[in-house]
């Protein structure tokens, strides 16, 4: 039986990335939600990677208003793993989060712990081209600055994202041809009204007016991201040793131009896993840091800042 183009394209793409990054003998833990992206990723990996080197984890967010869906999604993921002969690991949040950003943080922390406990070397996620495009457009609209265009790498910091060049439409087609279904979260559309409008209205309207334009836009933003990353001043954060534990050096911050100061602050927030900030937040932080006081404490962008004569630090 001849393989369809969708199957060939996705499986070959994932296999090429595994080979390119020499991952043939690496143990990979798949972050499995039951949605189209993660189901397609898991299925493809079972075809191009050794099954005994694969595992899948479902992260239950806890007893919130969506708990019935979460229970059913976990059961769906467990049955899928049994069908594909993959080890399944259910995890549960130890606390309820207040926002999607907090859930994301809890999820990655739990996945990282499980990875270490079970001897996995990588966590694979189903982030795809449309996810990345929507995120960059949202950050552009909110004025996050150049850091909002940060390149998302296929392989970095123990995370493997092989679907970044694949669209959601291609993933849906792949699942249809594999005769596999997904289990979508009914609350997804309500989580971020702006993202939902971009996905369901603006991007679809753009594609109708100019076929192929969304893919071209995604490529253009990726090119910008790569150019920003490769500029000499791109990594201001790297010039602050031990920034994760000690924060930023205030003396270094004061030598920078206003533009560079905002870039450094954005890089610092991103390094701490903070994403929900805007250009106005960065400008407000700058104003607070302009004061001549040696010791300052304030709260901006959902973070508690502590400043002394030597350091600028966000309290965890």
Curated annotation (Swiss-Prot):
It catalyses: cytidine(34) in tRNA(Ile2) + L-lysine + ATP = lysidine(34) in tRNA(Ile2) + AMP + diphosphate + H(+). Pfam families: ATP_bind_3 (PF01171). Gene3D superfamilies: HUPs. Keywords: ATP-binding, Cytoplasm, Ligase, Nucleotide-binding, tRNA processing. GO terms for cellular component: cytoplasm. Its EC number is 6.3.4.19. GO terms for molecular function: ATP binding; tRNA(Ile)-lysidine synthase activity. It comes from the Bacteria. It is found in: Cytoplasm. ATP binds at residues 33-38. GO terms for biological process: tRNA modification. Its main location: cytoplasm. The keyword Phosphoprotein does not apply. The keyword Iron-sulfur does not apply. HAMAP family: tRNA_Ile_lys_synt. Belongs to the tRNA(Ile)-lysidine synthase family. The N-terminal region contains the highly conserved SGGXDS motif, predicted to be a P-loop motif involved in ATP binding. PANTHER family: TRNA(ILE)-LYSIDINE SYNTHASE-RELATED (PTHR43033:SF1). Ligates lysine onto the cytidine present at position 34 of the AUA codon-specific tRNA(Ile) that contains the anticodon CAU, in an ATP-dependent manner. Cytidine is converted to lysidine, thus changing the amino acid specificity of the tRNA from methionine to isoleucine. This is tRNA(Ile)-lysidine synthase. It comes from Bdellovibrio bacteriovorus (strain ATCC 15356 / DSM 50701 / NCIMB 9529 / HD100). The gene is tilS.
């Amino acid at each position: 039986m001849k393989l369809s183009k969708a199957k060939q394209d996705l499986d070959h793409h994932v296999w090429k990335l595994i080979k390119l990054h020499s991952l043939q003998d690496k143990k990979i833990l798949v972050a499995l939600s039951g949605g189209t992206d993660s189901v397609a990723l898991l299925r493809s990996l079972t075809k191009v990677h050794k099954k005994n080197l694969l595992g899948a984890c479902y992260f239950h967010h806890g007893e919130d208003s969506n708990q019935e869906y979460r229970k059913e999604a976990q059961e769906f993921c467990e049955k899928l793993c049994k069908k594909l002969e993959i080890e399944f690991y259910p995890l549960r949040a130890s606390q309820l989060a207040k926002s999607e950003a907090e859930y994301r943080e809890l999820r990655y922390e739990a996945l990282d712990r499980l990875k270490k406990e079970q001897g996995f070397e990588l966590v694979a996620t189903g982030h795809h081209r449309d996810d990345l495009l929507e995120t960059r457009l949202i950050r552009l609209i909110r004025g996050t600055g150049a850091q909002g265009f940060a390149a998302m790498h296929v392989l970095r910091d123990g995370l493997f994202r092989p679907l970044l060049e694949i669209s959601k439409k291609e993933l849906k087609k792949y699942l249809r041809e594999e005769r596999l279904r997904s289990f979508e979260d009914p609350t997804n559309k309500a989580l971020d009204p702006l993202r939902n409008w971009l996905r369901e209205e603006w991007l679809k309207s753009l594609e109708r007016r100019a076929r192929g334009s969304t893919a071209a836009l995604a490529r253009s933003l990726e090119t910008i991201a790569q150019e920003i990353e490769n500029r000499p001043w791109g990594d201001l954060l790297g010039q602050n040793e031990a920034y994760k534990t000690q924060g930023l050096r205030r003396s270094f911050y004061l030598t920078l131009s206003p533009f560079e100061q905002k870039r450094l602050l954005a890089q610092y927030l991103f390094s701490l896993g903070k994403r929900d900030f805007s250009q106005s937040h960065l400008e407000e932080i700058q104003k607070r840091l302009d004061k001549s006081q040696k010791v300052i404490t304030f709260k901006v962008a959902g973070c508690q800042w502590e400043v002394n004569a030597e350091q600028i630090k966000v309290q965890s």
